UniProtKB/Swiss-Prot annotation:
It is found in: Cytoplasm. Heterooligomer composed of large and small subunits. InterPro entries: Exonuc_VII_S (IPR003761), Exonuc_VII_ssu_sf (IPR037004). GO terms for cellular component: cytosol; exodeoxyribonuclease VII complex. PANTHER family: EXODEOXYRIBONUCLEASE 7 SMALL SUBUNIT. This is Exodeoxyribonuclease 7 small subunit. It comes from Rhodopseudomonas palustris (strain HaA2). Keywords: Cytoplasm, Exonuclease, Hydrolase, Nuclease.
Amino acid sequence: MADAAPADVKKLSFERAMEELETIVKRLEDGKVPLEESVAIYERGEALKRRCEELLRQAEARVDKITTDAQGQPVGTEPLDVQ
């Protein structure tokens, strides 16, 4: 991460949040980050993880499954049960 202020997590797209999260994981796994910075980027990583989970739940809620009649012909859609 550069010296620029990090983007607001709540405004990030799924792809951007995942990209940043992957960068944070790599930096933490490297073990070369000072303790104070490690704590700060870990906290940001947690926020990014929550954002990704939120966006995935929203996407799942929008997914429809196709319903078919007895002959297998599509007749409509209904919400996908993602439990």
